[in-house]
Amino acid sequence: MGCLLFLVLLEFQKIWGSFEAPQTSFPFRFLQISSFANHSWTRTDGLMWLGELQPYTWRNESSTIRFLKHWSQGTFSDQQWEQLQHTFQVYRSSFTRDIREFVKMLPGDYPFEIQISGGCELLPRNISESFLRAALQEKDVLSFQGMSWVSAPDAPPWSQVVCKVLNEDQGTKETVHWLLHDICPELVKGLMQTGKSELEKQVKPEAWLSSGPSPGPDRLLLGCHVSGFYPKPVWVMWMRGEQEEPGTQQGDVMPNADSTWYLRVTLEVAAGEAAGLSCRVKHSSLGDQDIILYWDGKRVSRGLIVVLVILVFVLLFVGGLVFWFRKHRRYQDIS
């Protein structure tokens, strides 16, 4: 594996240049999951993100990385992408073969799963930070630091053997270093140019309050709903004046169908202590104009509001039909 990857590296470096980091950065992350059921069956899938967006995927059934965005090629040429695809094809076949060889050398047996995570982030002054870690059954085993493989602090003793074998392969180490510290930052720089409009998209949230099912006698469950915001990072808190309420419970940030996000934050309080509470929302799309909603004790849920509005329309419609019917019948009586 090392010799072949090293030769590929020497050929590739002839056409790849240096990069300059842009002012705004988005972390690039990839995750590889490889499942080994036995000595002959294995599956490897890969996912890649730039910030919150997923520009690539690599399914086990495919020999190439698939573009998920129209701007996924970045500023790389077709030739550069073709060579990268070849590098990863060599890597995947070599990885599977090498893992099977390690299984013969080390304690343990099939089935097992390996997770490999890595990525890079561009920082000011043309600096980048990169990382690469490997885990077995979700427990860290080793990482790539500088130009060497290093065993994780709580890794089993056999991880030292794996690191020793990997560190003897100078060609592969140089290829990994090149991919992490040269190619990854250059790829991210290009993606931030071609995907600029989508990466920097800002959508303002809307927020509303509700009261949930009573958690007990003389107790209230207050809900603060925030929806339709993008990007994902958001800060929502129940407040009393300028003080944060320590009992605030935040749910998971959930995706909407339009690629924006939704969050519900709750607070359980005594009925007599609800007055004076407010929900505060901070988001990048709002600038310094935070959303502040005050609890007045008369809030009803948005669902109930919708039901009431529908009821009003139904009553108006029925009333209109009755009025029309009576008027029409009166005209018939006159004629």
UniProtKB/Swiss-Prot annotation:
User: Which stretches make up the Ig-like domain?
Assistant: 185-295
Where it sits in the cell: the answer is: Cell membrane; Basolateral cell membrane; Endosome membrane; Lysosome membrane
Residue positions the entry lists as glycosylated: N38, N60, N126
Give me the residues that bind a D-galactosylceramide, please. D98, D169, Q170, G171, T172
Give the intrachain disulfide bonds: C120-C184, C224-C279
Which of UniProt's keywords are assigned here? Cell membrane, Disulfide bond, Endoplasmic reticulum, Endosome, Glycoprotein, Immunity, Immunoglobulin domain, Innate immunity, Lysosome, Membrane, Signal, Transmembrane, Transmembrane helix
Q: Topology versus the membrane, per the UniProt entry?
A: Single-pass type I membrane protein
One GO MF term on file is:
lipid antigen binding
- Name it: Antigen-presenting glycoprotein CD1d
Its source organism is Ovis aries (Sheep)
Gene of this entry: CD1D
